[in-house]
Amino acid sequence: MKTLLLTLVVVTIVCLDLGNTANTLFCDNSNVPSIRTRKRCLKNQKLCYKMTFFTPGFGWTQIKGCIHRCPESTPNEKYQCCSTDNCI
């Protein structure tokens, strides 16, 4: 009986943990356009983003990753956000 109870507890913990990871967003974390690096976002980060900005001498540069809300674009920084896995 103790073994059955212990087994049920372990199965419950594993299932709950899998449920939490199923709701986790994955975003591309690479700053190189031709390379994708998958990164698991934190629970409060529900968006993937790409920020593009101009750097004198280098041209347009991008930074990608996870974020909790999408900032507004400015003339010098352009943001794109989306809410599905590896969407940017």
UniProtKB/Swiss-Prot annotation:
Work out whether the entry's keyword set contains Signal.
Answer: yes
Keyword Electron transport, does the record have it? no
Which body tissues produce this protein? Expressed by the venom gland.
Could you tell me which cysteines form disulfide bridges? Answer: 27-48, 41-66, 70-81, 82-87
Q: What start and end residues bound the annotated signal peptide?
A: 1-21
Supply the Pfam families for this chain: Toxin_cobra-type (PF21947)
- Keywords, comma-separated and alphabetical: Acetylcholine receptor inhibiting toxin, Disulfide bond, Neurotoxin, Postsynaptic neurotoxin, Secreted, Signal, Toxin
Q: Name one GO cellular component term.
A: extracellular region
InterPro entries from the UniProt entry:
Snake_3FTx (IPR003571), Snake_toxin-like_sf (IPR045860), Snake_toxin_con_site (IPR018354), Toxin_cobra-type (IPR054131)
Main localization is secreted
Family to which this protein belongs:
Belongs to the three-finger toxin family. Ancestral subfamily. Orphan group II sub-subfamily.
**Function per UniProt:** Binds with low affinity to muscular (alpha-1-beta-1-delta-epsilon/CHRNA1-CHRNB1-CHRND-CHRNE) and very low affinity to neuronal (alpha-7/CHRNA7) nicotinic acetylcholine receptor (nAChR).
Its recorded name reads: Three-finger toxin 3FTx-2
Q: Which organism is it from?
A: Micrurus corallinus
